[in-house]
Every structure is written in C-alpha cells, then in structure tokens.
Amino acid sequence: MKILVTGAGGLLGSTILSLFKDTYHIVGYTRNDLDVVDYKEVQKKISFENPDIIIHGAANTNAEECEGNKNLAYNVNAIGTENIVNAVLQNNKNIVLVYLSSTGIYGAGKNSPYTEYDPVSPTTVHHKSKLEGEKVVQNLNKYLIIRTGWLFGGGVKH
C-alpha cells in the first residue's frame, strides 16, 4: 500500500510520516515540494506517485494570516483541496482521500463532544475555508474527513 501525505512538513503530516515509514510505502510532500494551488503540478505528482491513499494535510493554519489575507486562505485550503480532489478523479477513482479539517468549523464551542451531525457555523476565514474544502472532498466516493482540534507535540511551540 502506498500513502501520499501533503503537508508533510507540518506537525501532523511529519508525525504521520514518522509513524508509518516502517509499515507502509509512504511519500511526503511539503509546501516546497508541492504547490497545491497549481493544478497541473498536483495532477502530475499524484499521477506519478499513484498512491492508494492520500492524507491531505496541506493547509494554511495561521489564523491571523488567513484573516488578513482571505484569498491566500481560500487558495490553499479550498482551491488546493479542490485540485487534490480533481486530480484523484482524473487519475484513479479508487484512491482514498483522508482530509484533515478542523473542529473550528462548528463555530462557538459547546459543552459536549461534537458529532458529524452537529450543525456547522464557522466564524473565521480559516475555518470557513476548511469547510469549503470539506464540501469538495465529499464529491469523492472514497474519503474520510478528520476534524482535529488543537494539536500539540513534535517540539513545535504554540
């Protein structure tokens, strides 16, 4: 089984690479290796790698930067995700896409755990752009959306 990870330079992407490197054939792309906003580049790399699973973690997670530059947030988080989805559809419909989203799409917090049936009401540009990414991912037959909260570890200061 071959796994391709986008966002491999991030906290979660690098951890996934480290955890699975001895078990699976896993390839990671950082933002320097793959510009998800460039559809031709995305299509070419997915076609070349021909993975069974794509774990799509490439995103702009800097909330302040997203608020200050809505286009940048949407380009990476929504259009970049759309490019991944379209490349999957063009290359191999059997690829499973795992999309790393955010619990922030729910909006204001609540006192009990969220479920996939809870209504979404994102309040920030970052979370709105992640929700747009989720909508695109749902055009695939084989996908998993993981909505993470705050992530800690890996020597990264928060």
Predicted regions and their residues:
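N-terminal Rossmann NAD(P)H-binding glycine-rich loop of SDR-like oxidoreductase domains
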Residues: 2-21
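SDR active-site strand-loop-helix element
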Residues: 6, 29, 54-58, 97-103, ...
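Catalytic helix-loop patch of NAD(P)-dependent Rossmann-fold dehydrogenases
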Residues: 75, 80, 104-146, 150-153
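NAD(P)-cofactor binding segment of oxidoreductase domains
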Residues: 53-54, 68-98, 131-134
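Conserved catalytic-core motifs of eukaryotic protein kinase domains, centered on the activation segment
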Residues: 64-71, 108-112, 156-157
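NAD(P)H-binding glycine-rich loop region in Rossmannoid oxidoreductase-like domains
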Residues: 39-76
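Adenosine-cofactor binding site in Rossmann-like domains, unifying the SAM/SAH pocket
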Residues: 25-44
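Rossmann-fold NAD(P)-dependent oxidoreductase module
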Residues: 15, 19, 87, 136
